[in-house]
């Protein structure tokens, strides 16, 4: 569905938030937009319609979970695999959570939905299912960012919670978003929240 939209507007503010929606008008009065930067893109025509401050270094916040989902989906783990939550997986998470407990059993698919919804405990369980340590998962995120040409992005965690040294730009977020929009598997997870 997202690919069928005429255009997508990503607004980045402080604190960082991003939104996507269909744009009904053909003109954008940019002087009326108050943000830390913005990017208006037409998927159908591969056309940048308006942009501002796309190279400015910003804190990525929840957009980090797009890359977390990227690494999770590119891991060689079947979505129907049952994952048993361990105490180790729940040691360090904080923030929004679904109250997972050691011993809980979920499919990898359910964890991916929970990640897209924004649950940090699901992000930790996924990270420690894909990799041996949280640091190894973050290293994969940074490697993928470099592979995609996201030269101004550094990930420090996979939840998006504030940590010193974590940074990105609107341009890099757009690069990742375009890459993920081409992944039908990712779009299936995201579509659930459009309904």
Report each predicted region and the residues it spans.
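Sec-dependent N-terminal signal peptides of Gram-positive bacterial secreted proteins and lipoproteins
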Residues: 2-24
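Short, Lys/Arg-rich N-terminal segment immediately upstream of the first membrane anchor
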Residues: 1-2, 51
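Active-site-adjacent loops and short helices of periplasmic peptidoglycan-processing enzymes
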Residues: 20-171, 180-181
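Extracytoplasmic
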Residues: 172-195
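Intrinsic disorder/low-structure terminal segments
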Residues: 15-20, 42, 185-188
């Amino acid at each position: 569905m997202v690919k069928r939209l005429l255009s997508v507007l990503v607004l980045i503010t402080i604190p960082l938030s991003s939104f996507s929606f269909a744009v009904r008008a053909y003109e954008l009065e940019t002087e009326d937009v108050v943000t830390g930067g913005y990017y208006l893109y037409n998927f159908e025509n591969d056309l940048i319609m308006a942009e501002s401050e796309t190279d400015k270094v910003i804190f990525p916040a929840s957009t980090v979970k797009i890359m977390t989902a990227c690494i999770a989906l590119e891991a060689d783990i079947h979505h129907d695999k049952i994952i048993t939550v361990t105490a180790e997986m729940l040691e360090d998470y904080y923030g929004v959570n679904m109250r997972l407990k050691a011993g809980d059993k979920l499919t990898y698919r359910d964890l991916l939905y929970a990640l897209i919804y924004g649950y940090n405990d699901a992000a930790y369980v996924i990270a420690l299912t894909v990799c041996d340590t949280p640091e190894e998962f973050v290293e994969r995120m940074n490697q993928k960012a470099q592979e995609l040409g996201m030269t101004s992005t550094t990930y420090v965690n996979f939840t998006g919670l504030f940590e010193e040294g974590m940074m990105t730009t609107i341009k890099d977020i757009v690069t990742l978003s375009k890459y993920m929009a081409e992944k039908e598997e990712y779009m299936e997870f995201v579509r659930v929240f459009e309904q």
